[in-house]
C-alpha cells in the first residue's frame, strides 16, 4: 500500500475567503495510472482534482478528474496548481506553458495570482426547442432572460450552456432539475450550465454566475474558470473591445455561500480578440493522505 498526498487548494478566493476547492497532486502524480487517478478523485470528492505531470512539449502537463470522470480542462484547478507551483519555487519564470488536450496554453503568474490562457470561445445560439428545454430545466421563462442573451452554446475547449438572466433574485431562486440538466448536457456534450446576471452582489463587478454540472458529478460549484471565460468573451463583444478586465462573481448565491472572484483579461491582436486570460488568487485549505492498495 502507498499513500498519495493531495493538497486541497481554494482557487478564485475573494479576498481571503471562499473560492472553489480543488485537489492538487504533484510529487505522487507521475506514476499513477488513469484508473488510480480517477479513484483518488472519487475519494477526494471535490469538484475537480488536478494531477501535475511532466511534459515532453511544455513546462508541465495537467490532467483533471471530477469524482465521476475525466474532464478536458479545469480553470480553478489550473489556477490552484500553478499558484502552488510558484509558491514552492518550481516555476522557472513568471510565464510558463501548460500542455493541454487542445495544445499548449500559456500560464502567467502575477504575484499571488495565476492566469490561464483560453482560446476565444465560439458562441452559438441554441434553437428554440432546446432553449425551451433549458429554461424548463431551470424553472424559468423567456421573459426572465436578458433581452440580448438568449441561451447560447459556448466552446473554448470545454462546452457550456450560457444563460443570461435579467434579475439577480431570479438567478438566486432558480429551481434546477438536475436529471434534466444532466440529460441535456450529455446530449449537447456540455460540461455545465452557466447561468448569469449582469447585476452583481458586490458593487463594481460585471456579472454574477451559477454553475450546474451534474453530467460530470457536480451539482453546483462556486467558481468555474472554463465557463467564466466564454462569459467574458460575450461581455467583451458587448463592450466593443474597449475593456481591459472583467470581474465575475460566483458562489455568492449558493447555500452555503462560498464567494469567488474570477478575473478575465482580453488579449488582442490586430484589433481582434486573440485570447482570454482567466485567473485569480488561491490559498491552501489543507492536505489529505489518500491510501491506494494496488
Language-model-derived ranges and their functions:
Residues 1-73, 79-294:
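Active-site proximal loop and beta-alpha junction motif in alpha/beta enzyme cores
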Amino acid at each position: 500500500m502507498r499513500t498519495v498526498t493531495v493538497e486541497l487548494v481554494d482557487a478564485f478566493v475573494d479576498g481571503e475567503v471562499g473560492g472553489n476547492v480543488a485537489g492538487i497532486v504533484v510529487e505522487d502524480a507521475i506514476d499513477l495510472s488513469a484508473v488510480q487517478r480517477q479513484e483518488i478523485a472519487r475519494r477526494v470528492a471535490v469538484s475537480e482534482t488536478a494531477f501535475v505531470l511532466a511534459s515532453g512539449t511544455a513546462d508541465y502537463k495537467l490532467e483533471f478528474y471530477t469524482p465521476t470522470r475525466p474532464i478536458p480542462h479545469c480553470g480553478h484547478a489550473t489556477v490552484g496548481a500553478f499558484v502552488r507551483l510558484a509558491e514552492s519555487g518550481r516555476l522557472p519564470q513568471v510565464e510558463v506553458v501548460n500542455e493541454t488536450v487542445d495544445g499548449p496554453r500559456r500560464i502567467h503568474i502575477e504575484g499571488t495570482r495565476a492566469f490561464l490562457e483560453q482560446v476565444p470561445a465560439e458562441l452559438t445560439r441554441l434553437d428554440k426547442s432546446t432553449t425551451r428545454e433549458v429554461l424548463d430545466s431551470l424553472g424559468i421563462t423567456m421573459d426572465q432572460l436578458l433581452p440580448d442573451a438568449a441561451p447560447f452554446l459556448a466552446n473554448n475547449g470545454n462546452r457550456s450552456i450560457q444563460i443570461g438572466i435579467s434579475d439577480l433574485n431570479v438567478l438566486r431562486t432558480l429551481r434546477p432539475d438536475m436529471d434534466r440538466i444532466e440529460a441535456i448536457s450529455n446530449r449537447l456534450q456540455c460540461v455545465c450550465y452557466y447561468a448569469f446576471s449582469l447585476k452583481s452582489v458586490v458593487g463594481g463587478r460585471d456579472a454574477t454566475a451559477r454553475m450546474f454540472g451534474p453530467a460530470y458529478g457536480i451539482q453546483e460549484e462556486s467558481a468555474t474558470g472554463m465557463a467564466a471565460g466564454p462569459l467574458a468573451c460575450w461581455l467583451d463583444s458587448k463592450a466593443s473591445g474597449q475593456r481591459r478586465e472583467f470581474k465575475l462573481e460566483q458562489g455568492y448565491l449558493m447555500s452555503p455561500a462560498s464567494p469567488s472572484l474570477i478575473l478575465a483579461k482580453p488579449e488582442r491582436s490586430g484589433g481582434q480578440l486573440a485570447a482570454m486570460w482567466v485567473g485569480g488568487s488561491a490559498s491552501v485549505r489543507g492536505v489529505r493522505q489518500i491510501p491506494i492498495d494496488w
